[in-house]
Amino acid sequence: MTDWTERYRPTTLSAVRGNNAARDEFIEWAESWDDHHESVVLHGAPGVGKTSAAHALASDMGWETVELNASDQRTSDVIERLAGRAAKNATLAGAVSGTTSTRQLIIMDEADNIHYQYDRGGKQAVTTLLKDANQPIVLIANEYYDMSRGLRNAAQDIEFRDISARSIVPVLRNILRKENIEFEEAALKQIAEVNSGDLRAAIKDLQTTVEGSDRITVDDVKTGGRDRAMGLFSFLDSVLKEDAAEEALQNSYDVDETPDDLLKWVEDKVPLVYDDAELARAYEFLSNADIWTNRVYATDYNYRWWRYATDNLAGGVAAARETQRGGWTRYGGAPYRSTRDSTRDTVVREVAKTGGFSMATARTAVIPFLSAITHLCKPRSLTVGMAAWYELDEAGVSYITGSGETTKKVASIVEDAAERRSEAVEAHAGSAFAETETEEKTNFTGNQDSDVDVQSHKSAESGDDTVRTANTPAEDHAQSGASETASATESASDSDASTDTDADDDDGQAGLSEFM
């Protein structure tokens, strides 16, 4: 299947949506180029139409194009040989005639990323090229101020702003009509809003959602797994096909998945795209990412190691690719069982609803913390309290603790949690599990058959010091709100910090604080 972002790329500037002011300024630059011979930088967020505008302008002006992509090595020799030859040689494509219709538009993508070792000398070569060229040159950048001062001073700049959802919807509507696919208008609006002004991502999500269907509804969008800041398939395209290492790494921060899940996705899908040599290099980076991910668990859930895993699985795998790739890739489903994926989504919703967190916070911060302090259902009393507070079933307890779903241990924990909830209701407590000190010994630590020893009971009565000692790294993670997970963990941190100082607090999170 052809990639819709390529099939429906605008062929004329009048079809470029959402940046009318930038479009008009770009046209003026081109039409007056003979007077100023100045190059131009188109800058703005990914997916707002910068590259499409450059190609559409060339089509409107009757200019040929010479393109130097981020995937090309951009040393001074390469730049002078490829782009310099087109810009300086007046005989190319009949430019000797001096007519504008025979000019060549030189397009250099990702001009803000000319800094890797293989681009050594590239910045100076481009700066020199901009000053001496007698052909129009367009530089394309996501971050204008990541470009060197020399490049910025040598070219005019035009900013492309994020495209509003209102401007994205007509584009999606037009595509579906050409594809003879029926649609609900609300579904298109939802896709446009989810993609936060990124037209390219919206088109990719649209194609993913309607794949194999002749109709798209709101329910299709809701169940399509696209409630992420950046879609997983857009992220995979970024890493495996489109973007340089730095941009791929930045995009990984916008995906609402933990690094260990992203690792599974990239590892599962990279063979669909890379050739043998690229695949060998990519697997080296994935192996490194796996080592860093395992170190998180080997160090009592020290999440600072995740950053190194992400560097390898996103930036490293992107760097292993020799060229950019276009076209459509059928990535297929999740790399792990769909039942597990469904369980995860259910648990995320329950934790978010009960704790008053956002879905993103529950998924990337709270659940990893709960997994750390209840790993393999230990300590049992804490696991029972968690299951009771969040009303988890066996699948939910199994998912968070990493235990087998059908084990007797998990089943007994769920039964005890249900009993705990019943007792709390009967006691008419202001908070479900904020028991008195007397009740705490019976309810929080469990009955005399509990696998927690007498010393653990005493510790629970005095503030659960034993549990704190056993789980210090995870506890510290929740209290510190470490930047490696998310600043949004403050709600979980506040609940934890209140255990000692606000045990009698009667707000909605008191039960969670007590169980922590």
From Swiss-Prot:
Bias (Acidic residues) ranges: 497-508
Binding-site positions, ATP: 44-51
CDD domains: AAA, HLD_clamp_RFC
GO molecular function, one term: DNA clamp loader activity
Low complexity bias: start-end ranges: 479-496
GO biological process: DNA replication
Keywords for this protein: ATP-binding, DNA replication, Nucleotide-binding
Cystines in this chain: none
Summary of the function given for this chain in its UniProt record: Part of the RFC clamp loader complex which loads the PCNA sliding clamp onto DNA.
Similarity comment: Belongs to the activator 1 small subunits family. RfcL subfamily.
Subunit composition and interactions: Heteromultimer composed of small subunits (RfcS) and large subunits (RfcL).
PANTHER family according to UniProt: CHROMOSOME TRANSMISSION FIDELITY FACTOR 18, REPLICATION FACTOR C SUBUNIT 1
Name this polypeptide is given: Replication factor C large subunit
